[in-house]
Every structure is written in structure tokens, then in C-alpha cells.
A protein has these predicted regions:
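Sec-dependent signal peptide recognition
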Residues: 2-10
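Extracytoplasmic ligand-binding site segments that recognize negatively charged/polar headgroups
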Residues: 129-142, 181-197
Length: 296
């Protein structure tokens, strides 16, 4: 079951091009779901990133219930733990939904199969996923609208954009680029493509993503390919929680620059994969780590 859940999560962060936009006083997601662009008083949220954004901009009072995650907690941990949970990221207890009488339900694409059932019950539903950093910025703005915290949201969006532009400016001065990948699993060795949040993070950090040259939305990196590309670093996320898993996945790993220089590490999936404002701070941390690799 754990492998199935993480595989679904991987699809969520790679295959999809989910976006959310405001147009003609309506909020529209990539699936054609539309809601009025206004403040909602009673919101059920299954997207961890949106929950984190709501707390950051002071819109948490609009939350009546959430869907909790199974693998990692949602920030701020102590406050989110006190919220009522009526399901998880992929499924909601419909009887509980009726009980809380929401005027808006915000879900991720992992709940797509259940959206129609919820809509038939007469509820406003929107899919909130972002698959890029720009998408996260847009999500911050939309979250501000639905929670009545538009000013606070735009302030947060600007702060995140400043951080992103600072990173881009610093990277533009570099004369060379590191090569690497963020891995989802080691059996087989699957990496995040460019069309994903982790892939977009690498791009903005000025890293050459070795998975970009492998066809498909879920690039499988063969031992021969890894040896040929000779990455400067390899990072793990999702189902990976130890560098040892990566090192022992193939006998070619120790032969790469990443293996020889011990540049194999694990990233916090709740930060690097989640469509939350916190990813921009995590990029700063990752940038410093990559700078140390460059200066070795």
C-alpha cells in the first residue's frame, strides 16, 4: 500500500500540468471546475500546501476540516494537529462533509475520482495543484482570494518572488553548472522530470537535470546512463529516506562524481514537493548545499 501511495504521489508531481487561474471573476482549474472568485467562510482542504499557505496569511479561520497526510506532517504542526480531519489527501468521508456544510472544498488531483460525487452533492470544488514554482505563486494569490486575505497573500507572493529572483540572479553569474537529479525511487531508479516541482526547482537553481534527456514523464535512469552522465550529486525524496538506499541501488553510483565525493543526500519531501510557500525557503537551503559541492 505504501508503494502505491508514493507512486500516485509521483504521478501527481510529474505527469500533471495542473494550474489554477482567475478569469472573469471566476477561479478556474485545469479540469474546468469553476467557482466564484470571492471569500468563502467554511472551507474543507485536502491540499497540504494550501493549508500551510492559509496559516501563513492568517486565513486559517476559514478552515472547518482537512484531509491529513499519512507520511509527513503539515506546518505549523501543533496548530494543524488540532484541526478536524475527515479523510486524507485522496479521499474524504462524504458523511462528514455533509456534517460540516462547507461552502468550498479544495482538493488535490489525487482526489479526482471522487470529485464528481462531491459536486453532485452541490458543493463548490476546485483542484489546487501546481506543478511549477510559478504555479505555486498563483496558488498563493488564489488562496488569498478564497480566504478573504488577498492583501496578505499578495505580500507573501511578493516575498516568495523576491527570493526566487535573487536565486536566479545569483545563478546567472555562474560560468558552469552542476549536473544532478532528484530521485523518486531506486527500484527502478526513477527521477523527477523537468515538468515537475522538483524539476522546476533544479532549473531555477541552475542545475542540469540529467533526467531531462530521458524520454517519458517518469524518466527511468539506467546504470549505463547514470555512468555516462556522471552527475555531481544525487538527491532522494518521496520513498527514499537514506543516502544508503541510493548508494546501494547500483554498483555504478560509487563510480560517479556524486558517489566519489559523497554528494548523495535526502531532501525533505514535505518541503521540496509540496505546493507551499515554504519551498522558496528550502530552495535557499538547497542552493547553499549545491554551492558547497561546487566549491569542493
Amino acid at each position: 500500500m505504501k508503494k502505491i501511495i508514493t507512486f500516485i504521489c509521483f504521478i501527481l508531481f510529474t505527469v500533471s500540468s495542473f494550474a489554477i487561474k482567475v478569469e472573469n471573476n471566476q477561479i478556474i482549474d485545469d479540469y474546468g471546475n469553476k467557482i466564484e472568485a470571492k471569500e468563502y467562510k467554511k472551507i474543507i482542504v485536502t491540499d497540504p500546501g494550501v493549508i500551510e499557505i492559509l496559516f501563513k496569511i492568517g486565513g486559517e479561520k476559514s478552515i472547518v476540516a482537512i484531509g491529513k497526510t499519512s507520511r509527513s506532517k503539515i506546518y505549523p504542526y501543533d496548530k494543524v494537529d488540532k484541526l478536524v480531519s475527515i479523510g486524507n489527501i485522496s479521499n474524504l468521508n462524504l458523511e462528514k462533509v455533509v456534517e460540516y456544510k462547507p461552502d468550498l472544498i479544495i482538493v488535490t488531483s489525487m482526489m479526482l475520482r471522487n470529485i464528481e460525487a462531491v459536486k453532485k452533492m452541490g458543493y463548490n470544488v476546485i483542484v489546487s495543484n501546481a506543478s511549477s514554482l510559478d504555479g505555486i505563486l498563483d496558488l498563493i494569490s488564489v488562496t488569498g482570494i478564497v480566504s478573504g486575505k488577498k492583501v496578505e497573500a499578495e505580500k507573501l507572493r511578493k516575498e516568495c518572488l523576491v527570493k526566487l529572483e535573487k536565486i536566479e540572479k545569483e545563478n546567472s553569474k555562474k560560468t558552469s553548472k552542476l549536473k544532478g537529479a532528484i530521485l523518486f525511487s531506486t527500484s527502478p531508479m526513477i527521477a523527477f522530470s523537468e515538468d515537475s516541482i522538483p524539476g522546476d526547482v533544479l532549473k531555477h537553481l541552475g542545475v542540469i537535470n540529467i533526467a531531462a534527456n530521458v524520454p517519458g514523464q517518469r524518466p527511468i535512469l539506467s546504470p549505463e546512463y547514470i555512468l555516462k552522465e556522471n552527475p555531481d550529486f544525487l538527491a532522494g525524496a518521496m520513498s527514499l529516506d537514506s543516502p544508503k538506499q541510493i548508494i546501494e541501488a547500483s554498483n555504478v553510483i560509487p563510480k560517479t562524481k556524486a558517489g566519489k565525493n559523497n554528494n548523495i543526500f535526502i531532501l525533505d519531501s514535505s518541503l521540496i514537493l509540496r505546493s507551499s510557500y515554504r519551498i522558496f525557503d528550502e530552495m535557499e537551503v538547497l542552493k547553499e548545499k549545491l554551492n558547497k559541492i561546487e566549491n569542493k
